[in-house]
């Protein structure tokens, strides 16, 4: 299922960009994605739009195919990608729920999962995280 609207694709797909070195001028944009739904990651590093990927992840908002316009936006604006495992996503989701008291879907927990999985990478850095997405079925929680 491919989406055509770039704005819709960015929101719904939630590549979950976050900026390291928050401050505007000296920032790095990192795409965060599930390891088992890494079509944007593979597309970014190969500079080729990967369309034959079959994402399998609890982050159901990230199961759709990367759109053409979104791929173009990624190539122009993202500096790198980091992926998170399913267990890292679940742990991040639990932390957001329990400590921030914010109900988010698994897709929205991916950026935090990446940060928590690479503490040495983000040590002593100012990090901004975008949390969005509360489309969640309480009967289908991953724990």
Where are these regions (language model features)?
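Catalytic phosphate/nucleotide-handling subdomain of diverse soluble enzymes
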Residues: 116-143
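Anionic-ligand binding region
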Residues: 39-62
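Single conserved hydrophobic/aromatic residue that forms the stacking wall/gate
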Residues: 1-7, 11
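Active-site-adjacent helical/loop segments in soluble small-molecule enzymes
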Residues: 67-124
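Glycine-rich beta-alpha junction loops
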Residues: 8-9, 33-38, 55-58, 66, ...
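Short Gly/Thr/Asp-enriched flexible loops that form oxyanion-binding sites at enzyme active sites
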Residues: 12-22, 27
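Short, well-ordered secondary-structure micro-motifs
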Residues: 13-16, 40-47, 94-95, 139-141
